[in-house]
């Protein structure tokens, strides 16, 4: 904090002061963003009457960024939810959004796999009274299709007999799905 003088006469300067003024504010290193008064008081000189003009200390919002953002880039339909890790330098919580919730749905710090395809996951921190918003980060994740096997059943017939009805079954459905989901 600084101050200056106005009003010395006869080419005098601060060297004529018997007691220099003190300057202070109510803000400290941990004060949240806002405006704080700066006051000056306590000066004395035999030939001068002091008139103090205060000012304001403006504590602005601090910068922050997301310095950790980790998520698997590949998954397969039917896998367990993916975990997302992210931290902001402010310590504020990082939030997430999906460009394609039909593929990956955000649920807190997990991504629920809803279907095969591609989705971009965005990590963001909007800030608060003490921190500006962080720049958004993103990662594209590919969810591969699950393997579904169609297995033909063995069958037999006698010569010149009609071909019996041929049958098959599926193996590999995930998420309690069955043949009703096939197009």
Which residues make up each language-model segment?
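Solvent-exposed beta-strand/loop surfaces, strongest in extracytoplasmic domains of secreted
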Residues: 1-183
